[in-house]
Curated annotation (Swiss-Prot):
Principal location listed in the UniProt entry: cytoplasm
The protein's assembly and partners: A double ring-shaped homohexamer of HslV is capped on each side by a ring-shaped HslU homohexamer. The assembly of the HslU/HslV complex is dependent on binding of ATP.
Regulation: Allosterically activated by HslU binding.
Record-given protein name: ATP-dependent protease subunit HslV
Disulfide topology: none
Residues engaged in binding Na(+): G162, C165, T168
Key words, A-Z: Allosteric enzyme, Cytoplasm, Hydrolase, Metal-binding, Protease, Sodium, Threonine protease
GO molecular function annotations of the record: metal ion binding; threonine-type endopeptidase activity
Keyword Disulfide bond: no
SUPFAM superfamilies per UniProt: N-terminal nucleophile aminohydrolases (Ntn hydrolases)
Location of the protein in the cell: Cytoplasm
Organism of this sequence: Paraburkholderia phytofirmans (strain DSM 17436 / LMG 22146 / PsJN) (Burkholderia phytofirmans)
Cellular component terms per the entry's GO annotation: HslUV protease complex; proteasome core complex
Gene expressing this chain: hslV
Active site residues according to the UniProt entry: T7
Length: 178
């Protein structure tokens, strides 16, 4: 069976504000299965934002594990991310999961990959998924050349990615921490 895939998740941090947004399209092969999926969420009592790209079931499995790590480490985002990445890399079953996460709290944004990488994005901007490169390029240009808020930059970046990537639509969910 083909894997569910294709999405765009983008995060922008500017000053003491961060926004994380994603589109709503779920694709199975060349068929759009759902247009209004919610791939960006608030967890840990609303203090942490998380967005996911990749296999839907894989992403939900990782999201559950990440939430457990956050609880275990009292909301320490970096520690929870590193512990999840360690498990992801060493556990035989977890290694087969195909997904990526972007996580953000009031002070930190991290990208967590299936290779066991935990990346702190340069310049406070990162994006993942099939439309990630388009969204990241747009967000970087907007951040460098405008005074738009992180939420506005995320919204416009997702709009541009949705215009260019066939696996990304214009149904957006955007969460912020200010």
């Amino acid at each position: 069976m083909e894997q569910f895939h294709g999405t765009t998740i983008v995060s922008v941090r500017r000053g003491d504000k961060v926004a994380l947004g994603g589109d709503g399209q779920v694709t199975l092969g060349n068929i759009v299965m759902k247009g209004g999926a919610k791939k960006v969420r608030r967890i840990y009592n609303g203090k942490v934002l998380v967005g996911f790209a990749g296999g839907t079931a894989d992403a939900f499995s990782l999201l559950d594990r990440f939430e457990a790590k956050l609880e275990k480490h009292q909301g320490n985002l970096t520690r929870a991310a590193v512990e999840l990445a360690k498990d992801w890399r060493t556990d035989r079953m977890l290694r087969r999961l195909e997904a990526m996460l972007i996580t953000a709290d009031a002070t930190t944004t991290l990208v967590i990959t299936g290779n066991g990488d935990v990346l702190d994005p340069e310049g406070g901007i990162c994006a993942i998924g099939s439309g990630g490169a388009y969204a990241q390029a747009a967000a970087t240009a907007l951040a460098h050349n405008t005074e738009l808020s992180p939420r506005e930059i995320v919204e416009k970046s997702l709009e541009i990615a949705g215009d260019m990537c066939i696996y990304t639509n214009h149904n957006r969910v955007i969460e912020t921490i200010e």
